């Protein structure tokens, strides 16, 4: 079982580690992402203050052990006029069902905020396409850059 946890700014070290881990970020064509402490305050203000329908961010925590295992988010893409979601599970914690549970919880949270559909852009060949399809998403479009999936909430 998992739960979402809203981190304090001082706890963004977990996100920093997650984004710096090559195996965890192997799904992203950009590879690892630099997230130095000097960027935390601005990022925190943008993603977690104030809360509303434009952005949502939480750590994924194993509710039995209390261990942080990943992150879940959505944001409103005002260019395409859609909500984009993101689930990142630490590589060392994959294969235990955390991603699927987090995806379901993220969709419930989005629905509770009045969001009627949610999307994700996934790199072609990424195993998570199957995860999204198993959890009610459908492929909207696909090219050599991204597979766009969508779920009605």
Question: Could you tell me what each predicted segment is?
Answer:
Residues 71-76, 106, 113, 131:
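Long, contiguous binding/interaction regions
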Residues 100, 124-141:
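Conserved active-site alpha-helix within GNAT-family acetyltransferase domains
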Residues 135-153:
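Active-site/acyl-donor-binding loops of N-acyltransferases
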Residues 93, 97-105:
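Conserved acetyl-CoA pyrophosphate-binding loop and the N-cap/start of the following alpha-helix
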Residues 90, 109, 119-130:
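Conserved beta-strand-loop-alpha-helix junction that forms the acyl-donor binding cleft
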Residues 1-42:
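A short, well-structured alpha-helix characteristic of acyl/acetyltransferase catalytic modules
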Residues 33-84, 90-92, 143, 153:
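Acetyl-CoA-dependent GNAT
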């Amino acid at each position: 079982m998992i739960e979402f946890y809203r981190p304090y700014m001082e706890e963004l070290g977990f996100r920093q580690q997650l984004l710096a881990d090559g195996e965890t970020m192997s799904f992203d064509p950009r590879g690892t992402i630099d997230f130095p402490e000097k960027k935390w305050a601005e990022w925190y203000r943008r993603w977690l203050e104030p809360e509303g329908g434009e952005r949502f961010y939480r750590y994924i925590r194993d509710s039995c052990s209390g261990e942080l295992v990943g992150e879940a988010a959505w944001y409103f893409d005002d260019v395409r006029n859609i909500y984009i979601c993101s689930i990142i599970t630490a590589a060392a914690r994959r294969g235990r069902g955390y991603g699927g549970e987090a995806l379901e919880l993220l969709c419930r949270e989005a629905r509770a905020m009045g969001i009627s559909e949610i999307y994700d852009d996934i790199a072609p060949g990424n195993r998570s396409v199957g995860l999204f399809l198993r959890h009610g998403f459908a492929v909207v479009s696909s090219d050599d850059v991204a597979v766009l999936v969508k779920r009605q909430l």
